[in-house]
């Protein structure tokens, strides 16, 4: 189990509390959400944007998905919660977790453009619900 830096979480909550008009409990909740999101990914701040980009392998593990691939990149094995799944499902999971991020300014989950286009079924919604369940948003 990941141990969190409680001192840093409390400092972030107090800084947010002093800079905004939110209650301290709201600021503390936001600080915990941020700490849990940083376990899954990394913070990126540039060009007036603040985003948490999630690690694909960590997201697949969080969703209970195991995907192996050939050297060419094609899926060789996919299992969801220990049960064998189709190779196309593996592609959908890889597509749904690739380039997934949370925009801290807008408060929305998003992802980089899909390799397969918008028409292809993706597991992005399942990934977002797993993240929300983990960080308790």
Set out the residue ranges of the language-model regions.
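Charged, low-complexity intrinsically disordered segments and flexible loops
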Residues: 1-137
